[in-house]
Amino acid sequence: MTRIESTDRATEQRDALVGRLFEAAIGAMEVATIYTGDRLGLYQALDEAGPATPSQIAAAAGIHERYAREWLEQQAVAGILAVEDPAAEATERRYLLPAAYREIFLERDSLNYLGGLLRLVVGASRPLDAVLAAYRTGGGVPYPDFGVDTREGIAAMNRPMFVNLLGSEWLPAMADIHARLQADPPARVADIGCGTGWSSIAIARAYPTVTVEGFDLDDASIAQARRNVAGAGLAGRVTFHIRDAADPELVGRYDLVTAFETIHDIARPVEALRVMRGLLADGGAVLIAD
């Protein structure tokens, strides 16, 4: 009896894992089709055109009609798009993005926006051959090798939190720091692992007198951060530097040192935390969100 029960339990465990991995594989392919629609502007085209045929979406997005039709049909079967007239000929069916899903794909400042996360998933898979080689050799895979999808995916995934929460909830929850950021003389903030700069920009927008210095080791991220801050009109108060957060020669005195969604990515996190502590002015604080 014990052996039969054990066998039944093993079968249940096996079947559960088979089902889970099968669903994960289908989900991975679905992510790829969503990535395709995002990168080609197909969701945007649907949003602007309303119910539209494959040829109309193809013209709006600048792609071939056959590929537009295949993508639209797949998205409808996946339950992402709706079909207004399913009985029509394949070339005449009109597709639309349900209003309930608009936030997920198009509203980049919304906390429900998932385009960044899905782009990150695709980007993280690109250097798998290099990751396999690193396992064999003990080497590493430099962050730039993960490419633009990883970099911009992370930025787009984190941006809504900074836009909606950083200046209105997170920092005000630290009453003493919130007061210091509004006081004279103007406070100084160091934003460690700033990436493309959205956290630094959010701090500067929330506290109009502070100066923010962002630090990141990735050249491409800092270049984008500088473009972002110029577009935000805050270049006079927000500056960015290509520096290693774990470098003991990183010095300064700051009223607030922040690290948002970055400690888990730093090769030497303990050293980075030590440097962050050393950057504090008297009465300053370190804020880590990870």
Residue ranges of predicted features:
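Conserved adenosyl
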Residues: T2, A124-E271
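Conserved Class I S-adenosyl-L-methionine-dependent methyltransferase catalytic core
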Residues: D8, E12, R20-A45, A60, ...
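Short helix-to-turn junction characteristic of helix-turn-helix DNA-binding domains
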Residues: L46-G50, A204
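Alpha-helix C-caps/helix-loop-beta hinges
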Residues: A49, V77-A78, G283
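Short acidic, hydrophobic short linear motifs in intrinsically disordered regions
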Residues: P51-A59
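A short glycine-rich, Lys/Arg-flanked "PGG" loop and its adjoining helix->strand segment in the class I
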Residues: V270-D282
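Conserved beta-strand signature within the Rossmann-like core of class I S-adenosyl-L-methionine
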Residues: G283-D290
